[in-house]
Regions:
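Acidic, low-complexity N-terminal propeptides/linkers enriched in Ser/Thr/Asp/Gly that mediate export
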Residues: 282-283, 291-293, 299, 397-404
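Flexible, polar/acidic helix-loop-strand segments at domain edges
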Residues: 302
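Internal mixed beta-strand/loop scaffold within catalytic domains of large alpha/beta enzymes
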Residues: 63-75, 106, 391-404
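Bacterial N-terminal signal peptides
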Residues: 4-15
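Protein kinase glycine-rich loop
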Residues: 306
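Noncatalytic scaffold domains of N-terminal-nucleophile
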Residues: 21-56, 60, 68-236, 240-242, ...
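Internal maturation/activation junctions in enzymes
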Residues: 264, 316-404
Length: 404
């Protein structure tokens, strides 16, 4: 039954974001659930990415004798070219790596971090409430010091088999020679155009030639990104944080500081001091399986474990063809989300009760409430060992998401 739960949960995660309401045309992009299948699985390795070009690059690396990490680096670099709106080099991420020989599960945290000049109230209104999403994300204070390149470099140094430069070649060729932009990329450029890009002549020159997104039927080239990738291939990941590329990044941030005097800017120490964090995986036993995922500050892993644990308390899951199954799944996700939004934060700000939130007694009480409560939005629970909520319960507001 657990395999069925995982399958149903995966189907739901891939489809519900597009169905969520209300939706603005300027929201962060959602999934394309109607897209036809573009790949099949065979052999002893599977590659799954958001773009077939990235998947093909990863498969080619594996066929050339590369490790899974080599394939990962190649795929992520290609995504930076073909999906810059979602997977650019200036972002961040988490990585789980299983070393079968050592029987060791490793979690690396390469998420963005706030610069040293940040203050706790940078993105708050005078009332103490968070700024609206659109206003907050338009401010330079919302830009975090990127971790993607450091994450890829660190894991490649540990588990890579092919030369670092070799893994970046497919991305360099695509950026230099061009590719036909996907509907997702063109749609994201259109959203940015509606929101406003007057502050970035570079964006307009690259993504809005003649005032319009790149045509879908002609190759789109990004020579500047090709040069960036070539520098990374030649000088390695650290050059992004301490070399020529770091100087370019700091110059760009200084330009933002000139346009917005209240922005305190970045210093060389912000980039030079960036470090990937190694964390312990978050694991939970469910039936005969031990399920492991990424711990906080990621909140999605805990939510998935809670959702599965809640569903495991029900006997009403008869299969994907039954609407009741989907209703229960949606409710379980909503209840897990209530805990996620309240309890999960940056571990630097204090302990997070991940164990109590997965405690069997607590899960059982939440499952009973889930099945007996009306369909109103659930509130966060109080897990065992805690006498009171540490801060006020959140207002019911719609969460702004990002690319699935």
């Amino acid at each position: 039954m657990l395999r069925a739960l995982l399958l149903i949960l995966g189907l739901c995660i891939s489809s519900t974001s597009a169905a969520a309401a209300p939706v603005s045309r300027d929201d962060p992009e959602s999934a394309d659930p109607g897209q036809a299948a573009i790949s099949t699985a065979a052999g002893d390795a599977v590659v799954v990415t958001a773009n077939p070009r990235a998947s093909r690059a990863a498969v080619a690396v594996l066929k050339a004798g590369g490790s899974a990490v080599d394939a990962l680096v190649s795929a992520q670099a290609v995504l930076a070219v073909v999906e810059p709106q979602s997977s650019g080099l200036a972002g961040g991420g988490f990585l789980m790596h299983w070393d079968a020989r050592q029987q060791q599960l490793q979690v690396l945290d390469g998420r963005e971090v706030a610069p040293l000049s940040s203050r706790p109230d940078d993105l708050l209104q005078p009332s103490g409430e968070p700024l609206p999403w659109r206003e907050a994300t338009s401010r330079p204070e919302a830009i975090g010091v990127p971790g993607t390149v450091a994450l890829l470099w660190d894991v490649h140094q540990q588990h890579g088999r092919l030369p670092w430069a070799t893994t970046l070649q497919p991305a360099i060729r695509l950026a230099r020679d061009g590719f036909r932009p996907s509907p997702r990329l063109r749609r994201s450029i259109g959203i940015a155009q509606r929101i406003g890009v007057d502050h970035s002549p570079a964006f307009q020159a690259l993504y809005l030639p003649g005032g319009q997104p790149p045509p879908a039927n002609r190759p789109f080239r990004n020579p500047a990104l090709a040069r960036t990738l070539e520098l990374l291939a030649k000088d390695g990941g650290p050059s992004f944080y301490k070399g020529e590329l770091a100087q370019q990044i700091l110059a760009g941030m200084a330009a933002l500081q000139t346009d917005q005097p209240d922005f305190r800017g970045w210093s060389p120490a912000d980039l030079a001091g960036y470090a990937v964090v190694q964390r312990s995986p978050l694991c939970h036993r469910l039936r005969s399986y031990r399920l492991c995922t990424v711990p906080p500050p990621s909140s999605g892993g805990l939510a998935v474990l809670q959702t599965l644990a809640l569903l495991n308390q029900s006997n009403a899951l008869s299969g994907p063809a039954d609407p009741q199954t989907w209703r229960l799944l949606a409710r379980a996700q909503a209840w897990a989300d209530a805990d996620r939004l309240y309890w999960v934060h940056d571990p630097m700000d204090g302990a997070i009760p991940t164990g109590p939130l997965l405690d069997p007694v607590y899960i059982q009480s939440r499952a009973i409430a889930l099945q007996t409560s009306p369909a109103a939005r659930p509130t966060p629970g109080l897990p065992p060992g805690l006498a009171a909520y540490p801060h006020a319960l959140p207002a019911q507001r719609r969460e702004q998401g990002t690319t699935p």
